[in-house]
Amino acid sequence: KDSKHICFRLQCGNQSIALDSLKFCEARYRAGRRTYRLTDPLLGKGELNISVLAFPDAEGGIWRFTMKDMPEGALLHCYISEIRAKNLSRNGDMGADRADSFDAPQLPKEQKHYKLSLDGTTAYIVVEDQELRLPALVEGTSLYDKSEKWRSEIESSLQISTPDPYFNPLGGALAAAADGIWDGKIWLHGAIGWRSQLNGWRAAYIGDFIGWHDRARTHFDSYAASQVTDVPATIPHPTQDTALHLARSVKKWGTPHYSNGYICRTPYRKDQMHHYDMNLCYIDELLWHFNW
């Protein structure tokens, strides 16, 4: 129910075209920022440049539109609505759903429409709280600059210098990816797919590897507080779940799996079972942290 479809449509005079259907698009990624340069016969000699950033301190993001020689009266129609699929597999983050699942329904019931004038040189669109809004130029500039400052600091925190100019940008890209899986307490399982908390996933190696030792310590402290210490192992092996063809341990406190020493998947919780046993991964990451 929280998934939204956002789309843009460009209008010049009595003609319009979806923004992703323009004749030419140059798309680039730079360590947490996407940029697009768009041209089309509909624009004549005009050029539309778009820069997109996520907010560093809230769920949301901002588009900056920069116009050059655009036709007079050009408009950008902005739409946000519910998505077509009513139910998604694993929140839709694993690519297991139909290709059109995130498209707008043919007859949206919750669609909102905004018009952005492209007569100036710069304009902004913000998405926050699952809604679009068109901020004033001063506010938009402030929000964009704040987000760009954060992005730039993250990018510059890890620098690689080699004779290969195509390899060197990986430092900033790696730092941006690492920041994307940090939720304030722990390193998440993944940034898009599997964006969930797991105590021993491989992401926890990244903190010390790129020099973010404070985040690494926060992660390990958070999960050290999730280790079970008051449930002795009273049920001997075998304790596999017959309903699952012995493929997993039966979820019952007191088994060798779910007893003292077991680390739960959510920080600061000691009462949560999960089919993974990630103790070995967590301890290996912790030892590498001590080594650093």
Q: Model-derived features: where do they sit?
A:
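Low-complexity, acidic Ser/Thr/Pro/Gly-rich terminal tails and inter-domain linkers that flank the onset
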Residues: 37-56
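Short, surface-exposed loop/turn motifs at beta-strand boundaries within globular domains
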Residues: 29-31, 56-60, 196-199
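Substrate-binding groove/exosite segments of carbohydrate-active enzymes
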Residues: 149-292
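Short small/polar-residue motifs
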Residues: 18-26, 45-51, 109-114
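Preference for long, amphipathic alpha-helical scaffolds in soluble/luminal domains
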Residues: 89, 102-119, 127-164, 168-181, ...
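An extended acidic
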Residues: 1-41, 126-159, 163
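Detector for glycine-centered tight turns/loop "hinges" at secondary-structure junctions
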Residues: 14, 43-45, 261
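Polysaccharide-binding surfaces and accessory modules of carbohydrate-active proteins
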Residues: 50-133
